[in-house]
């Protein structure tokens, strides 16, 4: 009988970011008080699940999000660089408003190719590293469940890849809320589908896109 394995992709909780910058891979961005509550809600959501493997992006906000689940399950938090946030040329800049990066003519050349995209890490490279991380977690948790804590764009990109959809998309329409769970099911090595849940509810409408 073919064994079922589920790899859950948990997005980190809300980050303390009063300046509303696109923080990307920058250090020093940790969870807000609300984000810490989101991490607890996610850990509670996994209660009763057969989680035997827990791995996180190396970034602080992801490690913090993994913390409550590690405490609840007794699992050590592994770190996988393949789960890190996507590289972005606008890292550290303000995205929205009158002074946002999209309003400055000097930035328009970077926006020339939304298919790649020209402003950051190529989607094909994000998908490749995330797929490798997901398959490694599947192999480590055969017949059980694994949780990988990552970031919105990497999670959304691997979902698009697995479902055979175009990488070209509107970031505002990603189904990947803060502290959400995108669950990837496998029957043996075969991809069997994706389900989605929001243990902490929907992301606020004024959140920084892609954060």
Where are these regions (language model features)?
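Acidic, low-complexity terminal tails and accessory targeting/binding regions
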Residues: 1-5, 75-79, 85-97, 139-144, ...
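Active-site-proximal alpha-helix that buttresses catalytic centers in soluble enzyme cores
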Residues: 5, 10-77
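Short beta-strand scaffold positions
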Residues: 56-57, 128, 149-150
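Short glycine/proline- and acidic residue-enriched helix-loop micro-motifs
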Residues: 104-125
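Generic structural signal for well-ordered alpha-helical scaffold segments
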Residues: 40-47, 127, 131-139
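Generic beta-sheet signal
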Residues: 7, 144-152
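Short, active-site-adjacent cap segments at secondary-structure transitions
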Residues: 16, 61-63, 86-87, 154-156
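Active-site signature of alpha/beta-hydrolase-fold catalytic machinery across serine-
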Residues: 68, 157-161
């Amino acid at each position: 009988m073919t064994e079922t394995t589920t790899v859950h992709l948990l997005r980190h909780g809300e980050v303390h970011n009063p300046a509303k910058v696109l923080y990307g891979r920058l250090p020093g961005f940790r969870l807000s008080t609300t984000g810490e509550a989101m991490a607890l809600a996610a850990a509670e959501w996994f209660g009763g699940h057969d989680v035997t493997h827990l791995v996180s992006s190396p970034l602080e906000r992801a490690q913090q999000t993994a913390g409550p689940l590690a405490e609840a399950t007794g699992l050590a938090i592994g770190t996988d660089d393949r789960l890190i946030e996507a590289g972005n040329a606008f890292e550290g800049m303000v995205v929205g408003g009158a002074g946002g990066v999209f309003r400055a003519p000097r930035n328009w050349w970077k926006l020339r190719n939304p298919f790649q995209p020209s402003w950051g890490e190529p989607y094909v490279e994000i998908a490749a590293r995330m797929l490798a991380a997901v398959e490694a977690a599947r192999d480590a948790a055969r017949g059980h469940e694994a949780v990988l804590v990552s970031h919105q764009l990497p999670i959304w990109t691997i979902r698009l890849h697995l479902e055979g959809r175009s990488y070209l998309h509107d970031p505002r329409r990603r189904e990947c809320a803060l502290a959400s769970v995108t669950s990837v099911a496998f029957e043996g090595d075969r991809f069997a589908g994706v389900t989605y849940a929001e243990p902490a509810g929907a992301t606020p409408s004024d959140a920084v896109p892609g954060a």
